[in-house]
Amino acid sequence: MSTVAYSQTNNLTGSPYSLFGLGVQSNSNIGRNSALGNGGLALGSDRMINNLNPASFATIPKSSFLFDIGFLGELNTVSNNNRDENRIAANFSNLALAFSVNDKSGMGISIVPFTDVGYALIGIESNVEGSQDNFVSNITGSGGLNDLRLNYGYQLYDGFRIGVRTSFLFGTIAENEQVLIGDTFLNIDEDNFYNGFRFGVGFQYDINNKYTIGFTTDLPTRLDGTKDRFITKTLDAILTEEVNESGLDINTFKLPMEIGLGIGAKPISGLTVNMDYKRNLWGNTDQRDNIGQFTDQSIFSIGAQYRAREIGLKYWQNIEFRAGFNYDSGYLKVNNQTIDNYSFSVGLGIPISNRGSSMLNISYNSGRRGVVEGILVEENFSLININLSLKDIWFRKIKFN
């Protein structure tokens, strides 16, 4: 029998579900996408960087340079059968730049969080095997993986674009466990290091001037890992034993094939609608977590954006209004219960330059993850994404009168 209480963390996430696998998939997005249900496979990169589909980089206007930096704040309310607890996390969320190579191609580089870890299990009471004695453990985890990504898009012919991307995934997941057994205190620090490459492709096709379809696929890959471990044991506050190990091999972590299909539509002037579906084939990785199994994941998203004028002469005509919805079936099943989540989003694009070519993007997401059942908890989360998206023209000639 064990009892668990959750405490506050100050990492990029405070989700207790970041305990599983490599952590929770990051809520970070570049530019407008977080307000559009985290979707946009068929959207271009003509105004802002769209990191979801490498083919979009072919839409960057000639001689243009795009830059984006973001910040993410998160409030989580975790509920189980005994209590509710609030957690706050905030951090840098992305850095990206993109530019046109020529009038038919563009490329970009970005770094964004890939997974986030930030959990704390406080006061885990367990029995010493073979006796009536109890011991208490406190376990905390932090860190996550980053995605350093290079995108390239090329327009094969008018209305049809292809793209390729390469990601270098890397990062550290740290866990600390403190165990108290009578007068003996055990402290265990483990740092798990992962890295690996991943490759993907995409295309976009303009059916006409109102409808575009987008497609992406990311190939399955393996992330190699090593572990450093440092253990200290004290008795009556006196250090009695110390163990320091480094470079220990750990199991590789498999990432699945991911397939995405999106539709973009412009039904009326100023309105853009995006709808995406993604399928991540976790079941094919044939791997398990300590307390669950991986299952295929489906992600649905829909978003809409309205702007009064393409190039408005008045300031308010360049403001962009956005809203979206996202449903994620989850990829981990615990006690035959899949940990799914959903979220609603709203946002604004606030012009900070003439004609609205550069924007301050602000979005708010509200959603739920998991259910109160057995060892599972329900997590209600609120996210605020703030992105500064800048656009400029390279090699512009300056004329003097």
For each feature predicted by the language model, list its residue ranges.
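Subset of outer-membrane beta-barrel
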Residues: 8-401
